[in-house]
């Protein structure tokens, strides 16, 4: 999803606990178990992306679920799956 001059990266896109039918875009092997917005921000900083954080917004299909709270607009023209895969991999490295 392209928005506000970049790509919108919702937490659910990389969350292992969210099924693909509900919004996850990565395969289970690449997804991260219950990522936080802070982890996503650290990963984006480490990868050198420019971004804007929106912590109080909920992913519309999962408006009732706290896992779906928060997104980041990444200032890039890369494809969403590529960005999501890089961020998920970096979060795994940060976690150890």
Swiss-Prot record:
Pfam family name, one: SRP19
Cellular component terms (Gene Ontology): signal recognition particle
Signal sequence interval, chain numbering: none
Keyword Methyltransferase: no
Subcellular compartments: Cytoplasm
Alphabetical list of SUPFAM superfamilies matching this protein: SRP19 (SSF69695)
InterPro entries: Signal_recog_particle_SRP19 (IPR002778), SRP19-like_sf (IPR036521), SRP19_arc-type (IPR022938)
Key words, A-Z: Cytoplasm, Ribonucleoprotein, RNA-binding, Signal recognition particle
Protein's GO biological process: SRP-dependent cotranslational protein targeting to membrane
Keyword RNA-binding appears in the UniProt entry: yes
MF (Gene Ontology): 7S RNA binding
The organism's place on the tree of life at top rank: Archaea
Function: Involved in targeting and insertion of nascent membrane proteins into the cytoplasmic membrane. Binds directly to 7S RNA and mediates binding of the 54 kDa subunit of the SRP.
Protein family according to the UniProt entry: Belongs to the SRP19 family.
Family matches, as HAMAP family: SRP19
Oligomer and partners: Part of the signal recognition particle protein translocation system, which is composed of SRP and FtsY. Archaeal SRP consists of a 7S RNA molecule of 300 nucleotides and two protein subunits: SRP54 and SRP19.
Record-given protein name: Signal recognition particle 19 kDa protein
Classification lineage: Archaea, Thermoproteota, Thermoprotei, Thermoproteales, Thermoproteaceae
Gene encoding the protein: srp19
């Amino acid at each position: 999803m392209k928005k506000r001059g970049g790509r919108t990266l919702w937490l659910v896109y990389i969350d292992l606990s969210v099924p693909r039918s509900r919004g996850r875009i990565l395969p289970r092997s690449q997804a991260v178990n219950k990522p936080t917005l802070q982890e996503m921000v650290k990963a984006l900083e480490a990868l050198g992306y420019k971004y804007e954080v929106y912590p109080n917004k909920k992913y519309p299909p999962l408006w009732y679920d706290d896992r779906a709270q928060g997104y980041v607009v990444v200032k890039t023209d890369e494809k969403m799956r590529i960005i999501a895969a890089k961020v998920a991999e970096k979060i795994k490295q940060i976690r150890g």
